[in-house]
């Protein structure tokens, strides 16, 4: 969430910056609520002071042998009025907090201003798409022909947007995840983590999925008097980032760089009819996530580094890609700046997103109270959090299958994966 003080004191500026991402802040409503908050705050403090002053006079009256009943009645009346004002103030603060939790992050000044994805800005390309002397097939046809992708049984077992992988395709999928983890832990300095696939509501509030995007989640257990509800993770960003929720980290521990390979689960609400064929948009998919927790002054450089780490996976696999910086109107709810990495898919003759790398600055940290403390500082400060896919395993599999296809329907195994696949040079 945004800094409440900044929101209160710079309401018009905040509204202008949020408007660049298509979010309309109700300035009039917030202004009225803030005026009411100030009024209630003053009234509460004045009532508290009056009650305290009159309460002190009770002892003095008793010492003089005076009747204290009228004073006691006055204190009681003030107490009732004070309790009513406190309840009204608490309700108002809850309303303000609810509004604050629904307001997206402010775009960084370096993010290009634009309305939608058509105004994203390409910053670089790597590799040259291969030219084929035969008609290219998509990953669905190639995978089904070698018996590795089984959509029919996935529909029978569960429903649409699920997959059963078998044989050499399943092995390649596993090899990709292992390759990514090894690269990030041995060359990029990340610590591997094994995390829960079910998270509570506090965790989802911390990273920004709740309260606004509950319909995108698979909820497995509703909240009860005994505890919070549980939901399947939409990304390992949630458990990894929440490791520092309600925590004060020593400055010497920073930066903290974490990675995890997990299944991810998304309802894909609002995606009806999009990417219905193949592995591009699934309810369950594997992803290797990258998370960095850094000091504020280092977060923009950390974003460049994290994005480069994700790009390195594609470079080592020999997959052409381009990197774009998202315009303000296309950024995610909690992001201040985002790079999307898009891999080349020959069958679609276009680039498709395979990684999204974002700097959340202190937006998540404020929601989570994730802080760090320098030895020279009296008070702890909010961390900056970053995350990105390094990479989405299923989409990387799609890219490998399509870019490395041969005329006979076989698939060449990229050199980087051969050590993970028993030395196989081809599958199919």
From Swiss-Prot:
GO molecular function, one term: serine-tRNA ligase activity
Coiled-coil annotated spans: none
Sequence positions that bind ATP: 266-268, 353-356
Database matches in PROSITE patterns: AA_TRNA_LIGASE_II
Matching SUPFAM superfamilies: Class II aaRS and biotin synthetases, tRNA-binding arm
Gene Ontology CC: one annotated term: cytoplasm
Matches recorded under Pfam families: Seryl_tRNA_N, tRNA-synt_2b
Subcellular location: Cytoplasm
Binding site for L-serine: 235-237, 289, 389
EC number(s) per entry: 6.1.1.11
Major location category of this protein: cytoplasm
Biological process annotations from GO: selenocysteine biosynthetic process; seryl-tRNA aminoacylation
Pathway: Aminoacyl-tRNA biosynthesis; selenocysteinyl-tRNA(Sec) biosynthesis; L-seryl-tRNA(Sec) from L-serine and tRNA(Sec): step 1/1
Reactions performed catalytically: tRNA(Ser) + L-serine + ATP = L-seryl-tRNA(Ser) + AMP + diphosphate + H(+); tRNA(Sec) + L-serine + ATP = L-seryl-tRNA(Sec) + AMP + diphosphate + H(+)
Domain note: Consists of two distinct domains, a catalytic core and a N-terminal extension that is involved in tRNA binding.
Listed PANTHER family: SERINE--TRNA LIGASE (PTHR43697:SF1), SERYL-TRNA SYNTHETASE (PTHR43697)
Oligomer and partners: Homodimer. The tRNA molecule binds across the dimer.
Function recorded in the entry: Catalyzes the attachment of serine to tRNA(Ser). Is also able to aminoacylate tRNA(Sec) with serine, to form the misacylated tRNA L-seryl-tRNA(Sec), which will be further converted into selenocysteinyl-tRNA(Sec).
HAMAP family named in the record: Ser_tRNA_synth_type1
Family named by the database record: Belongs to the class-II aminoacyl-tRNA synthetase family. Type-1 seryl-tRNA synthetase subfamily.
NCBIfam families (UniProt xref): serS
Protein name (database record): Serine--tRNA ligase
Recorded name of the encoding gene: serS
């Amino acid at each position: 969430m945004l800094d409440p003080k900044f929101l209160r004191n710079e309401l018009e500026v905040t509204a202008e910056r949020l408007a660049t991402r298509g979010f309309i802040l109700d300035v009039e409503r917030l202004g009225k609520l803030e005026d009411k908050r100030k009024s209630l705050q003053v009234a509460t403090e004045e009532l508290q002071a009056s009650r305290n002053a009159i309460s002190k006079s009770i002892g003095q009256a008793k010492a003089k042998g005076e009747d204290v009943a009228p004073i006691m009645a006055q204190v009681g009346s003030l107490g009732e009025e004070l309790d009513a004002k406190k309840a009204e103030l608490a309700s108002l603060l809850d309303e303000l907090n609810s509004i604050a939790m629904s307001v997206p992050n402010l775009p960084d000044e370096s993010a290009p201003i634009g309305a939608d994805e058509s105004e994203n800005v390409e910053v670089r390309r790597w590799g040259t798409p291969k030219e084929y002397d035969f008609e290219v097939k998509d990953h669905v046809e190639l995978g089904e022909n070698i018996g590795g992708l089984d959509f029919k049984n996935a529909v029978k077992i569960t429903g649409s947007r699920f997959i059963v992988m078998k044989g050499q395709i399943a092995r390649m999928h596993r090899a990709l995840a292992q390759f990514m983890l090894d690269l990030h832990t041995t060359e990029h300095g990340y610590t591997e983590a094994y995390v829960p696939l079910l998270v509570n509501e506090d965790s989802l509030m911390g990273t920004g999925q709740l309260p606004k995007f509950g319909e995108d989640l698979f909820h497995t257990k509703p909240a009860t008097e005994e505890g919070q509800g549980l939901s399947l993770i939409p990304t390992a960003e949630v458990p990894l980032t929440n490791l520092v929720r309600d925590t004060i980290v020593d400055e010497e521990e920073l930066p903290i760089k974490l990675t995890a390979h997990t299944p991810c689960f998304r309802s894909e609400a609002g995606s009806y009819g999009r990417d219905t064929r193949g592995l591009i948009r699934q309810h369950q998919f594997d992803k290797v996530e990258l998370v960095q927790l850094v000091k504020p002054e280092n977060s923009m450089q950390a974003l460049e580094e994290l994005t480069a780490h994700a790009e390195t996976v594609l470079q080592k696999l020999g997959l052409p890609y381009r990197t774009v910086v998202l315009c303000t109107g296309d950024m995610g709810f909690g992001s201040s700046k985002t790079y999307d990495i898009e891999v080349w898919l020959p069958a679609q003759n276009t680039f498709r997103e395979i990684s999204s790398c974002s700097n959340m600055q202190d937006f998540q940290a404020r929601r989570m109270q994730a802080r760090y403390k320098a030895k020279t500082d009296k008070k702890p400060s909010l961390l900056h959090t970053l995350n990105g896919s390094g990479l989405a395993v299923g989409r990387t599999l799609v890219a490998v299958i399509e870019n490395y296809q041969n005329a006979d329907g076989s698939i060449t195994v990229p050199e980087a994966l051969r050590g993970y696949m028993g030395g196989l040079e081809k599958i199919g």
